């Protein structure tokens, strides 16, 4: 039976059936207006009241499309061929408008900052309530509990733009909570957050779960979803696995093939011939000790073995030198505070730190996008302020966190050719360089394609290709794996590693601990505009006090290794260490 559109969400639940399910999705299929391939293919699931479901899958698997079907954004706002049905609390959504469903299914989008636009926190939380016609007294009754629930009480008069990344995400969640929805959908809620911000958001998710809310969390990473009641694994618009995390997350090859990062603890257990699912470091430790009783936890201090020093650094002078640089934006607080840093030939340096610590600001000084208030930057021993833009571009290149801020040409080939042509290179040299770098990043077959029709991972690689065509000696990448699925992350880092081996110095700004552990040779930790640490990766991860001060959580496998009194940066390292001792 078709339900006629309602004029108010007040009436939403009136005709709802008595049901134990918050969400029932039946045979959902959808193809976007201009799409040639189905984004969803006969997807169905039921969510019990108070259940937390995680949805995993590669970019383009259909996760966000499925989420938009749950609150009528599809097919109401985003048109295409839609079939199937969704019921919320036993009431089918057929014919309802997005505004009718908003108070029942709250959604926090992947780009949570796009949801924030008011002048202060209180107005932000009030906005959605105003739109459904709630009176002021009711709004005031809901405002404080919503802010308390997310830890933002007392922030009512703060400008949202002044909040940290984690605080902004919590504000977006508070705006949804104020509507008292049955279901909250969070689409990759921690994508742009530092480890501390991620911990804040998932602590909040745990709190909401304890309150009995039904939660659907979309994630690339498996670590936090292990605590879900069930997980759904999607590939190419279809559900390929559904069940408790302990069942789904032991199929490591299927996860990897589906663009999902397999849990590192499960990988270590597999490499040791133990297998199974570890929900925590404690679980993994217990499983290893049961399998290998001779292994005992050691209280000894962790040996700080030096990493191998690349041959290129021996006796070399710095490619880039930052000398006592301080900087603040107009009328703003100090972002860099007398910071110094040297980048050597052959370096593979990871710059880490909390959101707002000054990492990107530092990188922009190196490539000349910003000028220091005090101090100076040298490129190959020359003061960068005296260099022309073209001279800087030949020495140091910068790839933005969002490749769409860098891409503008009509075709992939013209995007890559733009720099060499500006340098007045001969046409045959331009062609040679374009072919060379597009082949290196795996995009040669896309040379005539529209860049904006490429996937996020492909656009990221195109941005790298466009600066590589100038043959810089130093390449700086700002969060190069943000928004990419696991396969894309590995492909991007394999490319970056190969560039480093070819002689290009690499600087990666990142929040991802396993990426630092497995790829970088050196780490610089920035906190409040100052450099707290600059040294080898093993030394960094061995310093528990430093990591705690910086709110930087090491990979789980590193935490597990510490229980045995050793240091391991990957599942393979830990497995090898155990096998040597049993």
Across the structure, where does each feature detected by a protein language model lie?
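The feature captures the beta-strand-to-loop junction immediately N-terminal to the Walker
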Residues: 56-58, 352-354
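Helix-to-loop junction immediately C-terminal to a conserved catalytic motif
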Residues: 71, 367
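Conserved ABC transporter NBD signature motif
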Residues: 79-91, 375-383, 392
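Conserved ABC ATPase "signature" region
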Residues: 137-155, 428-446
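Conserved ABC ATPase signature
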Residues: 159-163, 167, 450-454, 458
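Catalytic Walker B motif of ABC-type/P-loop ATPase nucleotide-binding domains
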Residues: 184-187, 475-478
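Conserved beta-strand-loop-alpha-helix hinge in the C-terminal portion
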Residues: 238-265, 530-557
């Amino acid at each position: 039976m078709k339900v006629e559109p309602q004029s108010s969400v007040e009436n939403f639940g009136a005709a709802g059936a008595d049901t134990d399910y918050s969400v029932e999705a039946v045979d959902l299929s959808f193809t976007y207006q201009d799409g040639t391939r189905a984004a969803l293919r006969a997807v169905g699931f039921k969510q019990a009241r108070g259940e937390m479901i995680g949805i995993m899958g590669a970019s383009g698997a259909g996760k966000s499309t499925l989420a938009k079907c749950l609150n009528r954004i599809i097919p109401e706002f985003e048109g295409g061929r839609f079939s199937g049905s969704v019921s919320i609390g036993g009431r089918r959504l057929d014919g309802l408008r997005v505004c009718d469903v908003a108070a029942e299914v709250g959604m926090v989008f992947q780009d949570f900052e796009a949801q924030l636009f008011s002048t202060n926190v209180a107005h932000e939380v009030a906005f959605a309530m105003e739109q459904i016609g709630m009176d002021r007294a009711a709004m005031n009754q809901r405002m404080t509990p919503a802010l308390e629930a997310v830890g933002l009480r007392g922030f009512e008069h703060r400008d949202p733009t002044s909040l940290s990344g984690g605080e902004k995400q919590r504000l977006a969640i508070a705006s949804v909570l104020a509507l008292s929805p049955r279901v909250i959908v969070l689409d990759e809620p921690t994508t742009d957050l530092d480890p501390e911000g991620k911990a804040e958001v998932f602590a909040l998710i745990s709190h909401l779960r304890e309150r009995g809310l039904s939660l659907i969390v979309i994630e690339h990473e498996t670590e936090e979803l292990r605590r879900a009641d069930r997980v759904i694994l999607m590939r190419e618009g279809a559900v390929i696995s559904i069940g408790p995390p302990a069942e789904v997350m032991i199929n490591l090859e299927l996860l990897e093939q589906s663009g999902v990062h397999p849990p590192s603890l499960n990988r270590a257990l597999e490499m040791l011939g133990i297998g199974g699912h570890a929900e925590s470091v404690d679980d993994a430790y217990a499983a290893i000790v049961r399998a290998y009783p001779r292994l005992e936890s050691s209280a000894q201090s962790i040996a700080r073995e030096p990493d191998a020093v690349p041959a290129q650094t021996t006796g070399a002078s710095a490619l880039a030198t930052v000398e006592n640089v301080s900087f603040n934006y107009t009328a703003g607080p100090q972002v860099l505070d007398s910071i110094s840093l040297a980048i050597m030939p052959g370096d593979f340096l990871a710059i880490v730190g909390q959101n707002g610590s000054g990492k990107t600001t530092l990188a922009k000084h190196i490539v000349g996008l910003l000028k220091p208030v005090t101090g100076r930057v040298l490129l190959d021993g020359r003061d960068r302020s005296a260099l022309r833009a073209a001279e800087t571009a030949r020495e140091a290149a910068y790839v933005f966190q969002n490749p769409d801020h860098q891409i503008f040409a009509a075709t992939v080939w013209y995007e890559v050719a733009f720099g060499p042509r500006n340098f007045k290179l001969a046409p045959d040299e331009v062609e040679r360089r374009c072919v060379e770098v597009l082949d290196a990043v795996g995009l040669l077959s896309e040379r005539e394609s529209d860049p904006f029709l490429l996937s996020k991972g492909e656009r990221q690689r195109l941005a790298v290709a466009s600066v590589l065509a100038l043959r810089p000696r130093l390449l700086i990448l700002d969060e190069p794996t943000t928004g990419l699925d696991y396969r894309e992350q590995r492909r991007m880092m394999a490319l970056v590693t190969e560039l480093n081996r070819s002689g290009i110095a690499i600087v990666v700004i990142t929040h991802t601990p396993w990426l630092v552990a497995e790829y970088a040779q050196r780490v610089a930790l920035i906190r409040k505009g100052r450099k707290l640490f600059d040294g080898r990766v093993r030394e960094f991860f061995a310093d528990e006090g430093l990591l705690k001060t910086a709110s930087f959580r090491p990979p789980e496998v590193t935490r597990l290794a510490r229980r045995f009194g050793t240091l391991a940066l990957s599942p393979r390292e830990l497995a090898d260490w155990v096998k040597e001792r049993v």
